[in-house]
């Protein structure tokens, strides 16, 4: 993908912007998934059959019909088959536009959010607004699996290198869930760091954990959006490890009141949106 692609030049991300506090759906901006998928060779057919970009929006507020502020937390699922992903700063600005606008009730806001996101993503989107009372009952979760981070290895290079996965399997057939908290990449536009925890669930020849960790650490200076990184990890593992079944799930830390948690799989459904310790 060309980072200077014209479709990225119009994004508000990385630019000084005005904060609008009256509802305006035109603030939402899309990024074509095709940009990254062309580079991965999966624009026509994706190697995953289940997936979504799972967002949590913590800063949602509007006025009721009497002018009293209301607040909620949103769970949003944007289907992996949608034509576009949603650019995060535009999503933040769009949500801010609800702040001084009046709506009848939570259900009306939820419906408007869903309609607008569907139009921007050009695909299926699910939205659920949660009261703070309900959300407070959600515990801090952990991604199931064996953590691969405590290996006694030396890292000298932090440039992205998929070839670190070359010859990464042995002949032992296993089902494993492996977890790393060391995923870090950078925003495609602003170069700001994106911190994440990634879970890899697979059935196939056993993956060498040292090679996998070196590969994940190689994202440390790589510039891509969250969703693109997860699809790249999925494609690289399918190429080098060739598992029979594979899921890749990353949960990223919050920025601007939003966290993004992409999930891609060729065999299991989308997980519940459960926040981790860093979220």
Swiss-Prot record:
It comes from the Bacteria. GO terms for cellular component: cytoplasm. InterPro entries: GTP-CH-I_C/QueF, NADPH_dep_7-cyano-7-deazaG_red, QueF, QueF_N, QueF_type2. One of its GO terms (biological process) is tRNA modification. Belongs to the GTP cyclohydrolase I family. QueF type 2 subfamily. Catalyzes the NADPH-dependent reduction of 7-cyano-7-deazaguanine (preQ0) to 7-aminomethyl-7-deazaguanine (preQ1). This is NADPH-dependent 7-cyano-7-deazaguanine reductase. The lineage of its organism: Bacteria, Pseudomonadati, Pseudomonadota, Gammaproteobacteria, Pasteurellales.
């Amino acid at each position: 993908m060309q980072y200077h692609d014209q479709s990225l030049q119009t994004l508000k991300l990385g630019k000084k912007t005005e904060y609008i506090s009256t509802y305006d759906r035109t603030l939402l901006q899309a990024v074509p998934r095709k940009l990254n998928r062309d580079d991965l060779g999966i624009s026509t057919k994706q190697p995953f059959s289940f997936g979504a970009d799972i967002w949590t929006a913590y800063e949602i507020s509007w006025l009721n019909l009497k002018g009293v502020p209301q607040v909620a937390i949103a769970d949003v699922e944007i289907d992996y088959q949608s034509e576009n992903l949603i650019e995060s700063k535009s999503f933040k600005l769009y949500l801010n536009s609800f702040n001084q606008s009046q709506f009848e009730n939570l259900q009306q806001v939820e419906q408007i959010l869903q309609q607008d996101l569907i139009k921007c993503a050009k695909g299926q989107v699910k939205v659920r607004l949660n009261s703070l009372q309900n959300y407070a009952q959600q515990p801090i979760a952990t991604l199931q699996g064996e953590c691969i981070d405590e290996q006694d290895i030396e890292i000298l290079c932090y440039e992205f290198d998929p070839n670190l996965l070359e010859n990464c399997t042995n002949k032992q057939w296993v089902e494993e869930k492996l977890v790393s908290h060391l995923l870090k990449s950078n925003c495609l536009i602003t170069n700001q760091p994106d911190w994440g925890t990634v879970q890899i669930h697979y059935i196939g020849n056993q993956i060498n954990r040292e090679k996998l960790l070196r590969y994940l650490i190689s994202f440390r200076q790589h510039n891509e959006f969250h969703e693109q990184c997860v699809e790249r990890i999925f494609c690289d593992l399918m190429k080098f490890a060739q598992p029979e079944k594979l899921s890749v799930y990353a949960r990223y830390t919050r920025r601007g009141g939003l966290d993004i948690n992409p999930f891609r799989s060729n065999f299991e459904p989308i997980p519940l949106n459960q926040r981790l310790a860093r979220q």
